[in-house]
Amino acid sequence: AGYEPLSLLMEQREADSEKGREILGRIAEVSGEIPVYVASNEVLSEISGFKLARGMLCAMRRRALPKMEDLCGNARRIAVLENVVNPTNVGAIFRSAAALGIDAVLLTGGCSDPLYRRAARVSMGTVFQVPWTILETKDWPEHTMKQLRKMGYHTVAMALKEDSLRPDDEKLHNVEKLAIILGTEGEGLAADT
């Protein structure tokens, strides 16, 4: 997924297993030698704050986030998340985006981080597959919406209104580039969006 491993924390039984040695070998091939820390399951649970089901944690360096213009350049369908604060919801949206063929996800600064453990877990790993970036807070919504329209996107809001179109409405079938905007939990989209 393009993330650089920094260190590995694992149970002794995992370090001694064939699978564990295989994983360590693959990491060494790609990234060279990294620090490997070994401890009992109890110590790992205490350090991490949760029970490790697989007995292994890897700290990774975050990639630099792409610019919106680079991310959306060749994309046809994008999702824009406005202040979706619950990591579970962010993960579920990424999983749905992957299933629906969404090419990229843009998140406002008020959104939960897609790399939070809960978001990544609920997404079933799709946060590492669907390209995404975080928008500059100062640019949302006015500048970002102008930029999307300038790039050829039609913007549509996921909102329950009397004049709403169904997602399968024929008016949307021939739209070349579509930006689907989803609002925060509870209140939905802000009035100025």
Regions found by a protein language model. Give the residues of each.
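RNA substrate-binding interface of SAM-dependent RNA methyltransferases
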Residues: A1-E4, M10, A15, E22, ...
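Alpha-helical elements of the RecA-like P-loop NTPase motor core of helicases
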Residues: S45, R118, A191
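Short glycine- and Lys/Arg-enriched binding-loop motifs that mark or flank ligand-binding interfaces
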Residues: K51, P87, R121, A179, ...
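Glycine-rich phosphate-binding loops that contact phosphosugars or nucleotide phosphates
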Residues: C58
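Active-site/ligand-binding-proximal alpha/beta "capping" segment
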Residues: V156-T193
